[in-house]
């Protein structure tokens, strides 16, 4: 196999992954680094990559401070309530205080944001969400990043970070391959900003067979944000905090616009309100501090997302499913009916197609909702990711080591899904985190922290051999296929993924076991994971596309292993409705009012787990009373 080796040298800032986090990093890096060499490497094409690829109908994170709507502290409180207390408040505050300027940039670049004609402010869907005509959201934002970067490498999948050989624990770039040509790409860089995606398809999905890939989170998000960093030895945090979504059944169309803008509501199969009956027992589990429906009703304090899921799961288990979204009332209004369909056509076309194909007209019947399989990510309503330094002006000493959004590996920064402890960033917040990381990366270089980096040819050649090994395995053993795809000497990526998903579902609390696990199941699962890890050394790829699938699988595996270790470590049920520890069914603030932190030793693969302090830096009092935003 004679694939070319293409070396890109003397890079100042390498942006790994060009979703919203990566595009934000490239854009801001040019502002602070006028003379710096900025390079983007993207697995797909920057114009339509990442979670926003097919558009969005709302920007879910906007303070509206210029309109007197909210302050950053308010958003920290909101995220803290929704995540059952588990938030890196320094990072969340830092993102929130800068996110509005990001949204104003988007509008300046041509993103159509709907306006409230009476107030002149943006049209609110909810307290934090603003409505957009966002089918072309990603191409608009990508243009700014393309103009900022010296080079954009599309179709290059990064598989490993390069490490400096002159100073331990310092990044030196990354390597990967072109998914079309197969060429080996080497990027030697002073800093790396990881803006790669979180992980879908690590738990067995509900959508299988002809529906495979119709999942809520981007199916191409293969946990590379975590795979790249875990493999290099970066510390991770809150990886147990997976997310389960209540969405329209089988198409996973979003429900936000329906609840907030169309004012629809849910009921069980028999037309009954069902949530409140589950709250007394749930309050026993989590405590009044986290669930107090009376206070929520009086103060508009939201009930945490996971607890609403808990009510759905239990109502269905009690035999009163399915849960329906009551659309028949709202859809009698032609304007609201149009918005309901537009909402999907601007961001989840598959849901509109599915309803049309299965004769579901929400004007005449109330569509079903379901809870999804779990996903692992750090920018929606959950906070998995790397343990990163916060900003110098608000972070306590345990959260600060010199440069904002820098991981525990020197010169390696994160944005979006890659950063742990910052939920509710969404698209605008991820772009903002990219900006913050880029500003810090420029300072890191200007402070002389990236001098004298050395990468040997031996490291580069070793990685090349490793990356292309699945092709070699296939070439050597492909003639020994027994039948179909069964081979005594290798497994293919699809077989490996099926195995991984089965393990995650049955042992780590997927939908197949009603999101339930315990210490015994997790330990058995970890044993089986280690055997799967051995077998992944024998994964085979018949072509370059399958090589991409093989490396996506390896990143998903590393992510999943981390999720297992974190879920085992946190001996409580912190987020009922996301998952349950059957051996510790209560929330336990006495022992677990902490953030979990892990590190995988790159040499041995062994995990060490620790507790990190959880500081509430923002007080409980509102700084701005919530007004009626509709």
Positions of PLM-derived features:
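Core beta-strand elements of the Rossmann-like FAD/NAD(P) dinucleotide-binding domain
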Residues: 8-11, 181-191
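Glycine-rich loop(s) and the adjacent beta-strand/alpha-helix scaffold that form part
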Residues: 194-253, 427-440
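N-terminal Rossmann-like FAD-binding beta1-loop-alpha1 element of flavoenzymes
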Residues: 13-39
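Long, amphipathic alpha-helical stalk/connector segments used for oligomerization, subunit docking
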Residues: 447-542
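Glycine-rich active-site loop/strand segments that organize a redox cofactor
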Residues: 60-95
């Amino acid at each position: 196999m004679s694939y070319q080796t293409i070396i890109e040298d003397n890079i100042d800032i390498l942006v790994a992954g060009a979703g919203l986090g990566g595009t934000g990093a490239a854009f801001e890096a040019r502002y602070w680094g006028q003379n710096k060499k900025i390079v983007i490497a993207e697995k797909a094409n920057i114009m339509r990559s990442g979670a926003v690829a097919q558009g969005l109908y709302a920007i879910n994170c906007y303070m509206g401070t210029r309109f007197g709507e909210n302050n950053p502290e308010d958003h920290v409180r909101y995220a803290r309530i929704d995540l059952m207390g588990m938030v890196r408040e320094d990072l969340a505050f830092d993102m929130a205080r800068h996110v509005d300027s990001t949204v104003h940039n988007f509008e300046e670049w041509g993103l159509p944001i709907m306006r409230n004609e009476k107030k002149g402010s943006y049209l609110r869907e909810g307290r934090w969400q603003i409505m957009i005509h966002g089918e072309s959201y990603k191409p608009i934002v990508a243009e700014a990043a393309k103009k900022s970067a010296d080079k954009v490498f599309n179709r290059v999948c990064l598989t490993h970070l390069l490490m400096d050989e002159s100073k331990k624990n310092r990044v030196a770039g990354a390597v990967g391959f072109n998914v079309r040509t197969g060429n080996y790409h080497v990027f030697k860089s002073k800093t790396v900003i990881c803006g790669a995606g979180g992980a879908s398809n690590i738990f067995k999905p509900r959508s299988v067979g002809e529906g495979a890939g119709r999942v809520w989170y981007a199916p191409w998000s293969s946990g590379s944000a975590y795979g790249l960093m875990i493999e290099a030895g970066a510390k991770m945090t809150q990886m147990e905090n997976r997310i389960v979504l209540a969405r329209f059944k089988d198409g996973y169309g979003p429900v936000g616009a329906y609840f907030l803008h169309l004012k629809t509501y849910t009921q069980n199969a028999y037309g009954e309100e069902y949530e409140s009956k589950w709250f007394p027992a749930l309050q026993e589990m989590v405590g009044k501090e986290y669930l107090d429906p009376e206070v929520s009703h009086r103060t508009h304090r939201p009930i945490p997302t996971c607890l609403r899921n808990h009510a759905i799961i239990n109502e269905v288990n009690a035999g009163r499913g399915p849960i329906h979204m009551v659309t028949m009332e709202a859809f009698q209004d032609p304007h609201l009916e149009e918005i309901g369909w537009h909402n999907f056509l601007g961001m989840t076309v598959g849901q509109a197609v599915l309803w049309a194909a299965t004769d579901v007209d929400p004007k005449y019947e109330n569509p079903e909702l379901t809870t999804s399989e779990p996903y692992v990510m750090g920018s929606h309503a959950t906070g998995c990711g790397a343990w990163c330094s916060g900003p110098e002006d608000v972070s306590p000493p345990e959260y600060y080591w010199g440069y904002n959004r820098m991981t525990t590996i020197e010169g390696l920064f994160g944005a979006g899904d890659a950063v742990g402890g910052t939920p509710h960033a969404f698209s605008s917040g991820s772009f903002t985190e990219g900006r913050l990381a880029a500003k810090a990366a420029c300072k890191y270089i200007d402070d002389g922290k990236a001098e004298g980096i050395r990468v040997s040819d031996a490291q580069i050649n070793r990685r090349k051999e490793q990356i292309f090994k699945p092709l070699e395995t296939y070439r050597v053993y492909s003639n020994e296929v027994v039948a179909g795809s069964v081979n005594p000497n290798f497994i293919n990526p699809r077989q490996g993924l099926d195995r991984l998903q089965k393990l995650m579902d049955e042992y780590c609390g997927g939908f197949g076991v009603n999101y339930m696990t315990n210490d015994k199941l997790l330990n058995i699962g970890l044993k089986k994971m280690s055997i799967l890890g051995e077998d992944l050394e024998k994964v085979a790829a018949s072509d370059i596309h399958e090589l991409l699938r093989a490396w996506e699988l390896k990143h998903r595996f590393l992510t999943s292993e981390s999720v297992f270790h974190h879920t085992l470590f946190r001996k409580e049920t912190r987020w009922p409705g996301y998952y349950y520890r059957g051996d510790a069914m209560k929330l336990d603030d006495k022992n677990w009012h902490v953030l979990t932190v892990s590190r995988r030793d790159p040499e041995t693969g062994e995990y060490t787990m620790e507790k990190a302090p959880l500081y509430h830096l923002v007080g409980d009092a509102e700084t701005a009373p919530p007004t009626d935003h509709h």
